[in-house]
Amino acid sequence: MDFVRKYFFVSIALGCTAIFLMLISCSKKSADPDTVITPAKTTTPPVTTTPVMVTLAGNGVNLQLSYYSGGNADLGFTLMKQQSKIKTVRIEIEPNQVNNAIRWIKEASDNGYTIICTYHKAAVLGSDQLQDLLDGANWWKTNYAALSASGKFYINLMNEWGSHSLSAANYAGYYNQAIAIVRTVYKGIIIIDIPGYGQETYVATNAVLGVSTGGVKITDTDIALSTHIYPGNYVGQHVNATGSFASGGNMVKADLDYLATSGRTCLVGEFGNGTNGTADWSGLVDYAKSKSWTILGWSWAGDGGDNIHPPMNMISPNFQAYKAGSIYPYTTSSYFEVVYNKL
């Protein structure tokens, strides 16, 4: 801002000159409404492809409890507390497990962990159907109050909704509807899994930016985008912000770079080594970590294996029945270091 300085030279011999200077000085400060005053220049920041990324939470692990002992399982927190790198737990909840999940969340909260809870319906993984996503949103609307009474957590709206062929326009439009429902009960960051089982980084990014969507984009800005990383990761859609198109292939670091251009917090909601495929899952996880993204290993326990690869469980045996007042003596498994060394 410029400041007008007035200099007054009082002299009888130069009286006329002094009056002249005073008149000029007053005219520069005039508050006359007809005077055009140029305000301080404000500019809209340009869209950037290198946004400042925010770390959502500390690194940690996934727990899939719904399928063991009817969900009434011992979570193994006594052993977990001995693993100092584990700061966050992501808990997958099948729709019928609300009562058990209340205890899961309370135990995680009592043990001091940051908690992410995700609606997980195994029967519709990879679905492109709007109704499946809305079912998840309405489940949160119905159950958030009861669940959150046991402890604070981030909502991961739905686990792995959306196939590899889902369009960015539908991903954006459908999530706008689902997010609006969740917002009636929850005001925090909503984590949304990117489509293609957590692999289609371009689709999710374009849905946020409104690229190749006919103008549709995800309107809620308080969201985080979650990718899942395994050897089988495949990115089939590569339409970027300039309209360039590339063929599909294994997920590579550039795919994570493009996800970062969304301008939203990003995280690795799951990672592990136990699937078919040749993607460099280890290098990708390390790269995401170098970007300060939260990384969450699959899994503490609850993985059932696929009859080809051994279960990706960090503890042994798999989840056992919960007994009040009793602690099951889990031990770490041979898989433990695969995840833990990355955290």
Pin down the residues of each PLM region:
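Extracellular glycoside hydrolase catalytic/binding regions
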Residues: 58-65, 70, 78, 134, ...
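N-terminal amphipathic alpha-helix/helix-capping segment at the start of soluble metabolic enzymes
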Residues: 53-55
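Short, surface-exposed connector motifs at secondary-structure boundaries
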Residues: 84-88, 264-267
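Sec-dependent bacterial lipoprotein signal peptides
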Residues: 1-25
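Bacterial Sec-dependent N-terminal signal peptides
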Residues: 19-50
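The conserved SAM/SAH-binding core of class I Rossmann-like methyltransferase domains
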Residues: 91, 117-118, 269, 298
